Amino acid sequence: MIITMLAFARARRGVLGISLSSQVLIVLCLMYLVMYIDRVNIATVAPRMTADLGLSNTQFGLAVSAFSYPYALFQLIGGWVSDRFGPRRALMLSGLVVCSATICTGLVGGVGSLIAARVVLGFGEGSAFPTATRALSVWMPRALWGFAQGITHSASRLGNVLTPPLIAALMAYTSWRGSFVALGLLGLAWVAPWWWVFRDDPRTHKGITADELNRLPPSRDSSGNAHSVPWVRLARRMLPVTAVDFCYGWTLWVFLTWIPSFFFVHFHLDLKHSALFSSGVLLGGMIGDTVGGVISDWLYRRTGSLQVARRNLIVVGMLGAFCFLIAVVLTHDLAIVALCLSAACFFSELVVAPIWSVPMDIAPHYAGSASGMMNFGFGIAGIISPVVFGGLLDLTGSWAIPFYGSIGLLLLGACLSFFMRPDLPFTETKAP
């Protein structure tokens, strides 16, 4: 991912050697990295945290899913705020809330306070990604929307990869509580650069050049959308995308929440080795994000078809993950399971760049609201998936049965993808 970012920056040199759009993309990558570290760190500390606080698998699943209630709600609210008032202030506020909630997680004393900390974290992170999509829709050329979505989400998966060994190292020097405090303070690193680099309207940035402006989409002021959002009509267009994102999100929440415990409990690995195996699995996802963005844009340039570039790639990703998760259930060899999980994570993450590009394709002027509607499905999956997985695990004692849920939803998501129409732009109607 780092090599890809440097190549992109060199190809688009501007002031100080890096164009402003590249600087915006780099800061957004840093934001995705930090926010995913703060989101998934709880999975790595799960064995120690549950023992220390006396939590069952079901209680831990409830605490994890508590994040997703406000997260799902603020997909819609945050997307609207970014369309109406601009991403600059909205994203800075999100960052401050996330860092505060992460620090507070290190201070919890039981399941109640843990749930409260996760709820606050969900408020902060819920608006972040629709807001980032709104920012990308005005700061990135349309031909690079897939790449931009792929590379930013690749940064989030880099956070997934780094989190297990990073948390394990911090726990060796402090404790699981100290690791949350340290990460919360570290998370402030991207907020100041964001405020300094980003402007809601590229035309208002003093460092922007005429050449760079000509490469960007036709500008529309992000900090004061003159039209109210046509919620009902837009929601109808986005409903199939929301359903597909739910199916994808169910599986991702399994990877983010339960894979470290799967290696720790099912294969009896120690914390260090379960963290390393988990990082290897999530590394496959990081690669899939970048590859998905590059392939999606390449397909669009080659065919001119958004159906091919977005929908078909989503179907390939869903079916690939479906096949490799079946292999996970059918084998008990640690090495084969780890490889199949990595491949499943790779294919599931091929979905990310094209599906996050779809709201920008359908409704570029309402990209924040449209992507919020889409990722509402991901948030709902986050509410249900960790609890159902943990509950089935407690009820049956089998890891295979919860995995079957992901397998079925991946197949359903591939089928539902054929109802998406990224090639049909959303037609606006002016508010009276």
Whereabouts are the PLM-identified features?
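Helix-loop-helix hairpin linking two adjacent transmembrane segments in secondary transporters
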Residues: 152-205
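Conserved MFS/SLC helix-loop-helix module at the cytosolic interface between two early adjacent transmembrane helices
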Residues: 73-112
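Paired small-residue
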Residues: 97, 101-104, 112-120, 336-343
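Extracytoplasmic gate region of multi-pass secondary transporters
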Residues: 42-43, 236-292, 352, 356, ...
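Residue-level signature of mid-helix packing/kink "hotspots" within the transmembrane helices
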Residues: 40, 68-76, 126, 160-161, ...
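Helix-breaking motifs and short loop linkers at transmembrane-helix boundaries and internal kinks
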Residues: 54, 86, 107-113, 124, ...
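C-terminal ends and interior cores of transmembrane alpha-helices
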Residues: 96-109, 316-332
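Cytoplasmic helix-loop-helix junction between adjacent transmembrane helices
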Residues: 117-157
